């Protein structure tokens, strides 16, 4: 049985398919001594010698349960695996895996905090991130600037930013959270583009000065999970997550050995 190289490496936990495509374009992946090609088909059981950044990878399937964890990202951490500026990354505090690597389900910019999901199942990560899945991302947003019903309606209908036209699925004031001239809102999106929320508010002359992701799909950030801490999802929540994308994963119904 064959599969595309980006799917094979994604399933092994080496990043999302898009990330792997970028590495291939940059010439960082080789197969049997030759540069890999995007969309190249390989034998899933015996794909040959694969090098990533000149390091040989072990193509060994993880026979254990798929793993997903919640990480409460603090401000100041970046979502890259290796940062050339040597800043703290969200991967630094995660538990080590024996056979593969953690894949982040989307990203949060350095000044955003809150819920990040990580998994060792590249297919799950890809489906949760893909715009076609329409997975909700919920944020608590603190803004500085004048807000009114007209501006809220503009954000609901859609504004043009560098990524194109974007809109909130839901945007409502949080009246129980007020801090002087700052105002809090709950915002829900079904996509995750770079600095999207900040740019949306900037387009209506408001500044986002605090942004917290509190929910991704049906996974809510636990109130007792402190910043910089992680928590592994149990089999019940794993099943809910797979059901969210209509993805039948028989292995989650099996008991861990």
Swiss-Prot record:
Its EC number is 5.4.99.22. Residues 3-63 form the S4 RNA-binding domain. The active site is at 109 (nucleophile). InterPro entries: PsdUridine_s_RsuA/RluB/E/F_cat (IPR042092), PsdUridine_synth_cat_dom_sf (IPR020103), PsdUridine_synth_RsuA/RluA (IPR006145), PsdUridine_synth_RsuA/RluB/E/F (IPR000748), PsdUridine_synth_RsuA/RluB_CS (IPR018496), RsuA_PseudoU_synthase (IPR050343), S4_RNA-bd (IPR002942), S4_RNA-bd_sf (IPR036986). The keyword Isomerase applies. GO terms for biological process: enzyme-directed rRNA pseudouridine synthesis. The keyword Isomerase applies. PROSITE patterns: PSI_RSU (PS01149), S4 (PS50889). Pfam families: PseudoU_synth_2. SUPFAM superfamilies: Alpha-L RNA-binding motif, Pseudouridine synthase. GO terms for molecular function: 23S rRNA pseudouridine(2605) synthase activity; RNA binding. Keywords: Isomerase, RNA-binding, rRNA processing. It catalyses: uridine(2605) in 23S rRNA = pseudouridine(2605) in 23S rRNA. Belongs to the pseudouridine synthase RsuA family. Responsible for synthesis of pseudouridine from uracil-2605 in 23S ribosomal RNA. This is Ribosomal large subunit pseudouridine synthase B. It comes from Buchnera aphidicola subsp. Schizaphis graminum (strain Sg). The gene is rluB.
């Amino acid at each position: 049985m064959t599969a595309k190289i980006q799917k094979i490496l994604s399933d092994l936990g080496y990043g999302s398919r898009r990330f792997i495509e970028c590495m291939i374009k940059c010439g960082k992946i080789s197969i049997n001594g030759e540069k890999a090609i995007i969309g190249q088909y390989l034998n899933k059981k015996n794909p040959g010698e694969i090098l990533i950044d000149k390091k040989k990878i072990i193509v060994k399937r993880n026979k254990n349960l798929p793993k997903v964890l919640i990480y409460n990202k603090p401000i100041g951490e970046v979502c890259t695996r290796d940062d050339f500026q040597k800043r703290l990354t969200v991967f630094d505090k995660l538990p080590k895996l024996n056979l593969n690597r953690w894949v982040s389900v989307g990203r949060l910019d350095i000044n955003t905090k809150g819920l990040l999901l990580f998994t060792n199942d590249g297919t799950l990560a890809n489906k949760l991130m893909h715009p076609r899945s329409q997975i909700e991302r919920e944020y608590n947003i603190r803004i500085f600037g004048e807000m009114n019903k007209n501006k809220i309606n503009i954000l609901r209908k859609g504004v043009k930013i560098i990524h194109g036209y974007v809109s909130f699925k839901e945007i409502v004031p949080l009246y129980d959270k007020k801090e002087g001239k700052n105002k809090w809102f709950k915002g829900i999106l079904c996509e995750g583009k770079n600095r999207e929320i900040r740019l949306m508010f900037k387009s209506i002359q408001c500044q986002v000065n605090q942004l917290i992701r509190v929910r991704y799909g049906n996974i809510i950030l636990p109130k007792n999970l402190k910043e910089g801490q992680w928590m592994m999802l149990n089999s019940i929540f794993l099943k809910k997550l797979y059901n969210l994308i209509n993805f039948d994963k028989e292995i989650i119904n099996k008991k861990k050995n």
